[in-house]
Amino acid sequence: MLNLLCAVYKSSKKADTYLYVPGRDDFSRVPESLMKMFGAPRFIMIMPIKKDRTLGQVDIQTLRDELTKNGFYLQLPPPEENLLKQHLAAQSPKD
């Protein structure tokens, strides 16, 4: 399996949202509607995608598959924790 390179961009509109594309400034396969929501992409880095590499919240195989299939991968922030809901669940009587 070949090592791929990808360019990583941060959204100017959405916090903790990143766009991975196969080459620097190659947004040719990214839908226009997504680019409008994403805002002006802010270049972060060029990165090799190695199968033995780990990325915080991105599964490497999913990243490779999406880049190959769709020409981009959109990383969204994790859902916010609802601390009140967790607290109430912990306080509720257990049967």
Swiss-Prot record:
<dbReference type="Pfam" id="PF05166">
    <property type="entry name" value="YcgL"/>
</dbReference>
<dbReference type="InterPro" id="IPR027354">
    <property type="entry name" value="YcgL_dom"/>
</dbReference>
<feature type="domain" description="YcgL">
    <location>
        <begin position="4"/>
        <end position="88"/>
    </location>
</feature>
<protein>
    <recommendedName>
        <fullName>YcgL domain-containing protein Patl_2802</fullName>
    </recommendedName>
</protein>
<dbReference type="InterPro" id="IPR038068">
    <property type="entry name" value="YcgL-like_sf"/>
</dbReference>
